[in-house]
Amino acid sequence: MKKTVLRVISSCLMALLALGLFYLCSYAVLYLLAVLGFDSDRYTGLYCVSSYGLIMLFLWIFWRIARQSEEFIYFKKTSPSQKVSVVLVAIGLAGIVTIYMFGAAYLSKYLESLKEHLDEYKQTVDRYSDVPQEQVPLWDSMIYILTTFTLVPLCEEFLFRGIIMGQMRKIMPVGFAVLVQAVVFGLMHGLTLHIGYALICGIVMGLVYMFCDNFWMPVLIHSIFNFLGSSFSNILNLKQLGVPSDIRANISYTLVLVKYFFMFPAALAFVYLWYRYKKNKEDEARLIKEAMEAVAAESEEALSC
C-alpha cells in the first residue's frame, strides 16, 4: 500500500515538474528577449523557436533521467497501414475542428458572450493582430510558420502524450490517462473556444498513441493538424508571395472541402487502429494464458514423477 501511494505521488510530481519546466522556459525566453530589446509581438517566430527549443532540450534531459527507473514513452514499430491511417485521422480531425469553429461562429450571432470569446480567439491565433505584417521581417515569419508544424508539435507531444500521459499510465488505466492528459492539454490552451477543441484533439491523439504505442504517431497528427490549421494559411497570406485575395479564398475553400471529405475515411481509419489494438491485446492475453498453462502442466508432470 505504501509503495502504491509513493508511486502515485512520484508520478504526479514528475508530471507537474515537466509542466512547470514548460512554463518556466517560456517565461525565461520571453524575459531574455525583452532584455535584449526584442519585441516578442514583432519577433514571434524568434520567440517560438527559442522557447520551444529550450523547452524541448530540458524535457529531453528530464526524460533521459526519469526513464532510468522505468520507461514511459514508447516507440513501438508501426505498420505502413497504421501510418496511413494516422494521416487520415489527422486530416479528419482538422475537419472536425473546422466544423466546431463554424458552429461557434454561427452561435456567436445569438450569444454575445460567445462572440467575445470568438473575437478573443481570432486575435490570439492571428500572427499579425498586434503588429502589422509590414513591420515583421520575412525571416521571422518563415521561422514562425516552420516552427508551428515542426518544433511546436514535437515539444507539446513530448510533454502531454509523452511525459504526462506516460506518468499517468503508471498509476491508472490507460483510458483514464488519456482523459487526464487531454484535460491538461485543453486547459493549457487557455481560451474557452480553444480549450474545447484542444480537449477533443488531446483525446484523439492520446487514443491514437494508446492504439499504436508509438510516440511519433501523435506527433504526426499534431504536425499535420497545425499545418492545415494555421501554417498553410500563413504561407498564403505572406504579402511577399503576392497571392491575390480571390485565389487565397478559393484555395482556403478547397482546403475546407478536403478536410470535410476526409472525415469519413478518418473515422474508418480510427476504427481500424482500434481494431488492431484490440486484436493485439487479445493475442497477448492468449499467449500469456498459453504460457501459464504450459508452466502449470510442466509443474504437474514434475510432481507426478
Task: Label every PLM stretch briefly.
Residues 2-20, 69-106, 110, 250-261, ...:
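Interfacial transmembrane-helix boundary/kink motif in multi-pass membrane proteins
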Residues 119-190:
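Function-critical hydrophobic alpha-helical transmembrane segments in multi-pass membrane proteins
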